[in-house]
């Protein structure tokens, strides 16, 4: 449960004794791995009980616990290793994309759609949620228009719906293997972002409500909810404050 993808993405390894084969240099970057809620889920196709289904309204892939008999076909067939077999309940479990929050069931947002728990709790503000088929969505801009957010291992053929902005400091060949042939192009755009791209990046982690559309102004970006109500307003360029010498945290 803790690390089903261990060593799948890592580049470092122990040096063998006796003889030494050519190995690439060690590097590290953090890659959060969650269920991709694929358009063509391998887990769904593999389940002999038809216990896995994809919700048409939002694309969330779920396991019907009442139908699952613990055959573990989904565990075997998912290329991302996200369904896991629970030894206590004897059924498979996986990320549910916090669908209750998407439905507006959380009282914190007064019935408005809310982002998932992993997004709202992320202190690094590295995640953003939205609908990729809506041209007004910031996610649509990142994936379809600017093409800086790419799917993980697109060669698996499941059409995953979690997208990543590739890191700049990892070897390019490795990134092409993970994110496809557009990895270098995405890094180039992200390294020197346009005004609109920089604005959209400021929406990451800026609100717990789902941002359906946005508007970019000269100095700030505004995020709107489903009914075009404003849910967040953030500056595009964060102010830099230089502290006086007597307040510097140095010895």
Task: Label each residue range with its predicted role.
Residues 1-251:
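Non-ligating segments of multi-cofactor redox enzymes
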């Amino acid at each position: 449960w803790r690390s089903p993808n261990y060593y799948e993405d890592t580049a470092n390894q122990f040096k063998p004794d006796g003889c030494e084969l050519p190995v690439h240099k060690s590097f590290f970057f953090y890659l959060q791995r969650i269920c991709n809620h694929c358009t063509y889920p391998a887990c769904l196709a593999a389940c002999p009980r038809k216990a896995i289904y994809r919700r048409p309204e939002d694309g969330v892939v779920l396991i019907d616990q009442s139908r699952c008999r613990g055959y573990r076909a989904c565990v075997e067939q998912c290329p991302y290793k996200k369904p896991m077999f629970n030894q206590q309940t004897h059924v498979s479990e996986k990320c549910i994309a916090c669908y209750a929050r998407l439905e507006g069931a959380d009282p914190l947002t007064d019935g408005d759609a809310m982002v998932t728990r992993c997004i709202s709790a992320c202190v690094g503000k590295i995640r953003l949620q939205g609908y990729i088929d809506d041209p007004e969505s910031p996610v649509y801009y990142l994936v379809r228009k600017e093409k800086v957010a790419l799917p993980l291992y697109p060669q698996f053929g499941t059409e995953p719906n979690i997208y990543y902005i590739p890191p700049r400091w990892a070897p390019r060949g490795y990134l092409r293997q993970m994110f496809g042939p557009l990895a270098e192009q995405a890094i180039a755009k992200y390294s020197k972002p346009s005004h609109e791209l920089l604005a959209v990046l400021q929406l990451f982690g800026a609100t717990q409500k789902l941002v359906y559309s946005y508007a970019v102004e000269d100095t700030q970006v505004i995020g709107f909810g489903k009914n075009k109500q404003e849910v967040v307003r953030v500056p595009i360029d964060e102010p830099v404050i230089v502290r006086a010498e007597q307040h510097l945290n140095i010895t």
